[in-house]
């Protein structure tokens, strides 16, 4: 042991000097990239400010937003595990990022370490004509016919879960129940059934739910890709989820080859793919695309992720906002009652939802004032001139804030006012550039009509079937990142039957 120490000891000063040199280079690199922008003067070696981000993300992002608003530049900077990050408050600059998603500018990544977590077969990483073609092929998944099919499926699942919630609440009427996990489970059940319908059996669903929970937890943890760490568990879980969905793709493809009626999203998708392939064959053309089942499974996982967490967030905030605005709640109930009554025993149809204009305005206002996914991370593939006096360095992770944009432009943006989206005011059109919660540019949410319909359906049924009251405590409505935003108390409410159904 002494001999080993004797061999190493002469090198220790050089090793320490080398580490000190690396630390110095890191600080110089950060300062050079930061320039005149608001942000930390110096950063913690190697880790940067990842610990504050993980331990209190709400405080971290609130500070970045405040720094971005503190100057006329409209953006601020920080440093996370070797990555220089730039937070954008300005709506105009956010649009500049969204409009320049291409190989030599910005790459959408979905998460600061998204490519490692989500895998290669992912819609968000695509560019150009290939991306346009895929979105075109996805479009038939959201036609009125498809949305009508989904509404029937969603309604059955929603009622099942509402009954379960009410049964739980009736066991202890004076104790509030937290809805976040209940909403998550309901939306996961809904998403699975709408997207892959009969192709997931009971055992597959159980495994799917466990793996999706691994994924969700890993999104909020340090990106340590080692055995036993949440990030590694999440990465491996995504692989298993995609494999499961790939099997569903194959089963759906076989069903659609037999010209059976579509019963879920993947059926509509495979039906359209087969139509395009057959049309090319008739015209003597080559097969128009080459998607493997694995690739399609990856794209399906994108849909699931987008639908699941955003829908849960939106529903929780709907309950919070409707509880605190009883006059809006009454107008929602009146709007729903004009077209549907739970006592009628008739289903609430997609056509009925189309007629509920005030309900749609409420859904859009909820998404505006509490954008579920508050930021849309991109990475700069090359240097990019964002303003006249600042060039974003290559490799920078850029966070355009769609949440901040919702509070720019609109009159009294802090006020929950669904009337702003009614025909008389048309603020959705007047301030269209500020309404970014559903995205913008080539990667705008391809399923936004489905997302709005889903939220409208749940609100309509929840308000018609259930009486609810928030359990108010200090800070209960503060924002918590999980990774989409939710009320800090997990939305604790008292629930009771409103009708006999």
Curated annotation (Swiss-Prot):
<keyword id="KW-0479">Metal-binding</keyword>
<dbReference type="InterPro" id="IPR002403">
    <property type="entry name" value="Cyt_P450_E_grp-IV"/>
</dbReference>
<comment type="similarity">
    <text>Belongs to the cytochrome P450 family.</text>
</comment>
<keyword id="KW-0408">Iron</keyword>
<dbReference type="GO" id="GO:0016491">
    <property type="term" value="F:oxidoreductase activity"/>
</dbReference>
<protein>
    <recommendedName>
        <fullName>Cytochrome P450 710A11</fullName>
        <ecNumber>1.14.19.41</ecNumber>
    </recommendedName>
</protein>
<dbReference type="InterPro" id="IPR001128">
    <property type="entry name" value="Cyt_P450"/>
</dbReference>
<comment type="function">
    <text>No activity with 24-epi-campesterol.</text>
</comment>
<dbReference type="GO" id="GO:0004497">
    <property type="term" value="F:monooxygenase activity"/>
</dbReference>
<dbReference type="GO" id="GO:0005506">
    <property type="term" value="F:iron ion binding"/>
</dbReference>
<keyword id="KW-0560">Oxidoreductase</keyword>
<feature type="binding site" description="axial binding residue">
    <location>
        <position position="445"/>
    </location>
    <ligand>
        <name>heme</name>
    </ligand>
</feature>
<comment type="pathway">
    <text>Steroid biosynthesis; sterol biosynthesis.</text>
</comment>
<keyword id="KW-0812">Transmembrane</keyword>
<dbReference type="GO" id="GO:0020037">
    <property type="term" value="F:heme binding"/>
</dbReference>
<dbReference type="GO" id="GO:0016020">
    <property type="term" value="C:membrane"/>
</dbReference>
<dbReference type="GO" id="GO:0016126">
    <property type="term" value="P:sterol biosynthetic process"/>
</dbReference>
<keyword id="KW-0503">Monooxygenase</keyword>
<dbReference type="InterPro" id="IPR036396">
    <property type="entry name" value="Cyt_P450_sf"/>
</dbReference>
<keyword id="KW-0521">NADP</keyword>
<dbReference type="GO" id="GO:0000249">
    <property type="term" value="F:C-22 sterol desaturase (NADPH) activity"/>
</dbReference>
<keyword id="KW-1133">Transmembrane helix</keyword>
<keyword id="KW-0349">Heme</keyword>
<keyword id="KW-0472">Membrane</keyword>
<feature type="transmembrane region" description="Helical">
    <location>
        <begin position="4"/>
        <end position="24"/>
    </location>
</feature>
<dbReference type="Pfam" id="PF00067">
    <property type="entry name" value="p450"/>
</dbReference>
């Amino acid at each position: 042991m002494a001999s080993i120490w004797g061999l190493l000891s002469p090198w220790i000063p050089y090793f320490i000097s080398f580490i000190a040199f690396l630390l110095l280079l890191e600080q110089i690199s950060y300062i050079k990239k930061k320039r005149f922008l608001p942000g930390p003067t110096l950063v913690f070696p190697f880790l940067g400010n990842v610990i504050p981000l993980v331990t209190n993300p709400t405080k971290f992002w609130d500070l970045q937003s405040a720094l971005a608003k503190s100057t006329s530049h409209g953006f601020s900077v920080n440093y996370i595990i070797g990555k220089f990050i730039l937070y954008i408050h300005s709506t105009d600059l956010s649009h500049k990022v969204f409009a320049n998603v291409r190989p030599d500018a910005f790459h959408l990544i979905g998460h600061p370490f998204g490519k490692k977590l989500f895998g290669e077969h992912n819609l968000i990483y695509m560019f150009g004509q290939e991306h346009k073609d895929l979105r075109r092929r996805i479009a038939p998944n959201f036609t009125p016919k498809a949305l009508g099919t989904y509404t029937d499926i969603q309604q059955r699942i929603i009622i099942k879960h509402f009954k379960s919630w009410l049964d739980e609440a009736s066991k202890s009427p004076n104790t509030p129940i937290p809805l976040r996990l209940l909403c998550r489970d309901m939306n996961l059940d809904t998403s699975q059934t709408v997207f892959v319908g009969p192709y997931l059996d009971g055992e597959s669903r159980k495994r799917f739910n466990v793996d999706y929970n691994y994924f969700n937890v890993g999104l909020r943890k340090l990106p340590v890709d080692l055995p036993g760490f949440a990030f590694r568990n999440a990465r491996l879980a995504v692989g298993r989820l995609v494999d499961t969905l790939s099997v569903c793709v194959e089963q759906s493809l076989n069903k659609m080859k037999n010209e059976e009626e579509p019963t879920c999203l993947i059926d509509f998708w495979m039906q359209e793919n087969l139509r395009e392939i057959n049309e090319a064959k008739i015209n003597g053309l080559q097969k128009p695309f080459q998607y493997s089942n694995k690739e399609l499974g990856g794209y399906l996982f994108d849909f699931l992720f987008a639908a699941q967490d955003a829908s849960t967030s939106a529903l929780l905030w709907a309950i919070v906002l409707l509880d605190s605005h009883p006059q809006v709640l009454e107008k929602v109930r009146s709007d729903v009652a004009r077209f549907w009554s739970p006592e009628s025993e008739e289903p609430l149809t997609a056509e009925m939802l189309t007629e509920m204009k005030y309900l749609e305005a409420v859904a859009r206002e909820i998404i505006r004032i509490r954008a579920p996914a508050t930021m849309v991370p991109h990475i700069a593939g090359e240097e990019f001139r964002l303003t006249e006096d600042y060039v974003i360095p290559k490799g920078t992770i850029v966070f355009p804030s769609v949440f901040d944009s919702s509070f720019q432009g609109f009159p009294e943006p802090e006020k929950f006012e669904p009337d702003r989206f009614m025909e008389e005011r048309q603020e959705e059109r007047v301030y269209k550039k500020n309404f970014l919660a559903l995205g913008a540019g080539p990667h705008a949410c391809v399923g936004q009509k489905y997302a709005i319909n889903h939220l409208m359906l749940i609100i309509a049924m929840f308000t018609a079937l259930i009486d609810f009251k928030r359990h108010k405590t200090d800070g209960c409505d503060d924002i918590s990142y999980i990774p989409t935003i939710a009320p800090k108390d997990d939305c604790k409410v008292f629930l009771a039957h409103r009708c006999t159904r």
